[in-house]
Regions:
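Amphipathic alpha-helical repeat scaffolds of TPR domains
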Residues: 1-8, 31-58, 84-102, 125-139, ...
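Amphipathic alpha-helical repeat scaffolds
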Residues: 7-14, 23, 27, 44, ...
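Helix-turn-helix repeat elements of alpha-solenoid scaffolds
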Residues: 11-25, 61-74, 105-109
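Short amphipathic alpha-helical segments that mediate assembly, nucleic-acid/protein binding
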Residues: 19-22, 147-150, 160-165
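Solenoid-like repeat scaffolds
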Residues: 27-35, 79-85, 117-123, 151-157
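Long amphipathic alpha-helical segments with strong coiled-coil/leucine-zipper propensity
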Residues: 48-77, 82-84
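A generic hydrophobic-segment detector
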Residues: 109-155
Length: 176
C-alpha cells in the first residue's frame, strides 16, 4: 500500500517536468474524490516540486514551480483541518514541514514536529511508527540512520513509481 496516489497522467506530467500541470491535475482529482491518498500526494508533490523541481528538471532559469509553495501550504492547512488524525497525512506533512517549513513561516516548521508526533499517536502500523520515530530521532541530523527492515518498510509505503516514492527510497535506503 503506497502512501501516495499515482497514475499514468501524473507519470506523464512528471516525465516532462510539468510541475504546475501535475499539481493542477492532483487538485482536480482531490476535488472529485476527497481521498486522503490524493491529499498526501498534494502535500508531498507540492513540497518536492518546490524544493527539488528546478534541480530535477534542470530548468533553473525557467522555473515552473512558482505556485507550488502556495499549494503546499494550502493542502497542509486543509489536511490539518480535515484529516488531523490520519497518520499518513501527519507523516508526510510533518516530514516536509520539519525540513522546509521555514519557507512558509517559522510556526510551520515547528508544526512539522507536532505532526510527526501525531503520526506516532494515531498509527497502529509498526512500520509507519518506525519511520516517524527515525525522523524525530534524527530531526536535526544531516541524514537519517538506516531503518531496520528498511527494504520491507519502503516497499510497503513507497513503491518507487513516482519521483516522490523514489525520493523516500533514497532517503531511507540510500539508493534510488
Amino acid at each position: 500500500m503506497s502512501i501516495f496516489y499515482y497514475d499514468a497522467t501524473l507519470s506523464a506530467y512528471e516525465s516532462h517536468f510539468l510541475w504546475e500541470q501535475a499539481l493542477g491535475y492532483l487538485e482536480k482529482r482531490y476535488a472529485e474524490r476527497k481521498e486522503n491518498k490524493i491529499l498526501n500526494t498534494l502535500v508531498g508533490f507540492s513540497w518536492l516540486y518546490f524544493i527539488e523541481g528546478p534541480i530535477i528538471s534542470k530548468k533553473f532559469e525557467n522555473d515552473q514551480n512558482g505556485s507550488t509553495l502556495n499549494t503546499w501550504r494550502k493542502y497542509i492547512d486543509l489536511g490539518a483541518a480535515e484529516s488531523p488524525e490520519d497518520p499518513f497525512f501527519c507523516f508526510i506533512a510533518g516530514y516536509t514541514l520539519s525540513l522546509h517549513g521555514f519557507h512558509i513561516s517559522e510556526s510551520y516548521e515547528k508544526k512539522g514536529h507536532s505532526l510527526m508526533e501525531a503520526c506516532l499517536r494515531f498509527t497502529n502500523d509498526p512500520w509507519l511508527q518506525q519511520l516517524a520515530e527515525n525522523i524525530l530521532l534524527n530531526e536535526h541530523a544531516k541524514q537519517y540512520h538506516p531503518l531496520q527492515n528498511g527494504q520491507q518498510i519502503c516497499g510497503q509505503f513507497f513503491d518507487g513509481r513516482s519521483l516522490l516514492d523514489r525520493y523516500f527510497n533514497e532517503v531511507f535506503l540510500g539508493s534510488s
